[in-house]
Amino acid sequence: MSHNVEKITDAKVFKEKVQEGSGPVIVDCSATWCGPCKAISPVFQRLSTSEEFKNAKFYEIDVDELSEVAAELGVRAMPTFMFFKDGQKVNEVVGANPPALEAAIKAHVA
């Protein structure tokens, strides 16, 4: 099974896929220099391929590449996982905490 995390590098694409999208969406807001981001990235990748979460869309943004998007979302620490439902932000998990991330995804796609 392939990884289902798509990297978004353009603010317009972010708006189209996340803010104007439908269904459950999870966005990993991270940075290349962030150690905890690198540590939890394989967990996020694994969760994105889970049959249990097949109806959710998984995206990643680099807060340095998309600083205007990160500012608009209010990202203050990395990693921050943002949860959207039909374009509306409904939850977030801050920090590299695999159990909290998995629990939040389960609640989000239920």
Swiss-Prot record:
Active site: 34, 37
UniProt keyword Disulfide bond present: yes
Site (Deprotonates C-terminal active site Cys): 28
GO molecular function, a single term: protein-disulfide reductase activity
Domain Thioredoxin: from-to ranges: 1-110
Annotated site location: Contributes to redox potential value: 35-36
Protein's UniProt keywords contain Cell inner membrane: no
Keyword terms of this UniProt record: Allergen, Disulfide bond, Redox-active center
Alphabetical list of Pfam families matching this protein: Thioredoxin
Spans traversing the lipid bilayer: none
Disulfide bond entries: 34-37
PANTHER family: THIOREDOXIN-LIKE PROTEIN 1 (PTHR46115)
Biological function: Participates in various redox reactions through the reversible oxidation of its active center dithiol to a disulfide and catalyzes dithiol-disulfide exchange reactions.
Name of the protein this chain belongs to: Thioredoxin Asp f 29
